Amino acid sequence: GEVLEESIDAGIDWIHLDVMDGNWVVNETITFGPAVVQSVRERVGPNIFVDCHLMITNAERTWKQYADAGVDLIIAHIEAIDDPATLISEIRESGTMVGLVLNPDTESNAILPYLSELDLVLVMSVVPGKGGQSFMPEVEGKVRTFRAAIDEQISDGGRKTKLMIDGGIKAHNASMVASWGVDVAVIGSGLINDRASIAENISEIRSK
């Protein structure tokens, strides 16, 4: 709760929640479920954008619990779902925004066919769920592929899909990924650490 309040006081207006079920991620990590997500929503209020990154095996059966918990956007792993088109349609019909995410070793073609229906594409720059990893710069080509496809889609009058990157983003590489064309960078330990306050870390990142 204190971290949430400090983040909001520092100017954070988008909160990214990682949901892991202990099965799909490589290190068997379990984080939290819909009840905690709902408590986050209630704590931060309606003006903070909240997304939910589902690193789970059964997103197609459980996503509605997270929509009902009040998230603005649900992001599901393309590698963990059987019928992306149906899932996208169902989430959208619920009134919740929808995104797809892909792992560093998954080709962009896995998501590109669904791009026109997505509010967001998330490119992982570390392996999901495995702590202590370094940023993987080799995802640059994938990020730029999505940037070009989204720009073309927008120029044709299509959906203004956001492009997000997640994994190992800190002050020293934030400007680099921005130059690749990402709209949103997920920052965890680069923001919340013992080295400085959240506000100080934000200031450092923005100054790069």
Q: Where are the predicted features?
A:
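Intrinsically disordered, low-complexity Ser/Thr- and acidic-rich flexible linkers and loops
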Residues: 151-158
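Conserved N-terminal beta1-alpha1 strand-loop-helix module at the mouth
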Residues: 1-73, 81, 93, 97-98, ...
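Acidic, Mg2+-coordinating phosphoryl-transfer loop and its flanking beta/alpha structural elements
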Residues: 181-187, 193
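Alpha-helical scaffolding within the catalytic cores
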Residues: 106-109
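Active-site phosphate-binding strand-loop segment of PLP-dependent enzymes
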Residues: 128-133
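Acidic, divalent-metal-coordinating active-site segment for phosphoryl/phosphodiester hydrolysis
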Residues: 168-180
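Short secondary-structure boundary segments
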Residues: 19, 78, 102-104, 125-126, ...
